[in-house]
């Protein structure tokens, strides 16, 4: 199920979007160690159920102010891969901003998690607006790494991560221009400043 009334693909200020996805996966994993490794070749069969729910909505508070919110929850019954790195690359991700969709951050990945945030927006004109986005992310069971680079589940609800972004957006008929600054709780001192021009087009993934 997927529905949307948003007025923009990248920086909406009106409408809502909602998606409920249920998927069943069956596959085969092959692992080939590098030269000099004492680990042998490995082949595993995997099957799991994955459920996810996402919703974002925007509310007009006044002539200039809009308050949006975002929620995503995911549950996957998948087993661990051969090592920690492979496990994290296959784990579900919380990426509510355009910048986070383009980066790989292990701190915001888990097989089961809940993430939510608010999006206060101040409309300067029909073309320009100031936008704040502030999110919290909590894995139900965080994925940890032992001394052998194997994955295991940590204590339930023992980790919390956050990210925030402030941007100035110009919306044009052919795309958007955005100047932004953002911060992630992990890695430490993770600050980014950038300029985005045009549209970022993401196709549907085989594993959502």
Label the predicted regions.
Residues 124-126, 173-175, 187:
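Generic structural signal for short, solvent-exposed loop/turn connectors between secondary structure elements
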Residues 129-150, 182-203:
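C-terminal/domain-terminus segments
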Residues 96-100, 146, 205-208:
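Short, surface-exposed, polar/charged, turn-prone segments marking secondary-structure boundaries
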Residues 166-175, 190-208:
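Outer-membrane beta-barrel "beta-signal"
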Residues 153-182:
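C-terminal structured domain segments
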Residues 23-25, 180-184:
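Short strand-loop junctions, especially beta-strand C-caps/beta-turns
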Residues 1-125, 129-133, 142, 151-154, ...:
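C-terminal outer-membrane beta-barrel translocator/porin domains of Gram-negative envelope proteins
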